[in-house]
Amino acid sequence: MEIFLDTANIEEIKKGASLGIISGVTTNPSLIAREGRDLKEVVMEIVSLIDGPISAEVISLDYEGMVREAEELSKLHPNITIKIPMTWDGIRAVKTLSSMGIKTNVTLVFSANQALLAALAGATFVSPFVGRLDDTGHDGVYLIEEIKTIYENYNFKTKIIAASIRHPLHVTQVAKAGADIATVPFKVLTQMFAHPQTKEGIEKFLADWQAMKR
């Protein structure tokens, strides 16, 4: 499984990139707005830091507008993947963009049927929202399992990006469920490193070493 960062914050991306294990970045209009910068400016800075898929989302909700925005964004850099919302016009746009060789990421997916439609349209990625489903009393991880089974049954090439990851346990769960990618906030990435016994072990090793030197 691969790890993407779900952020538009350049400092977080720089820190994540320094690990050498981050394979891509996902953004959305909310994350871009939080940075108070132009979408294209932010995206171009991100592609200079991470050599992998960088998801940038369209703002238009109509078919023509989505295709137009997608064409403009895709011309900025080969690594840019266009995030398209899971709607009727969105799926139409994905089908068109797929035929043009433009990579797409269908976002705001909350059901296996939606993921099936995205794959049939030729989406490069599909993003089921695990945490948001959990918030409404549904099982977000089970949705990943359902999508994985369907995709394997019919040999779909669409990759599953587990999105709306709230904590490290989600990462473990979606990895076991078969997600191709987990896109995580920087906070969750840092939490994945932590375990009290790791800290205790390091402290003991250092204490023993210092005692020996005396």
UniProtKB/Swiss-Prot annotation:
Subcellular compartments: Cytoplasm
Organism superkingdom: Bacteria
Disulfide topology: none
Catalytic residues in the record: K83 (schiff-base intermediate with substrate)
Enzyme's top EC category: transferase
Pathway listed: Carbohydrate degradation; pentose phosphate pathway; D-glyceraldehyde 3-phosphate and beta-D-fructose 6-phosphate from D-ribose 5-phosphate and D-xylulose 5-phosphate (non-oxidative stage): step 2/3
Biological process terms in GO annotation: carbohydrate metabolic process; pentose-phosphate shunt
Signal sequence range: none
UniProt keyword annotation of Metal-binding present: no
Similarity field: Belongs to the transaldolase family. Type 3B subfamily.
Protein name, as recorded: Probable transaldolase
Organism field: Carboxydothermus hydrogenoformans (strain ATCC BAA-161 / DSM 6008 / Z-2901)
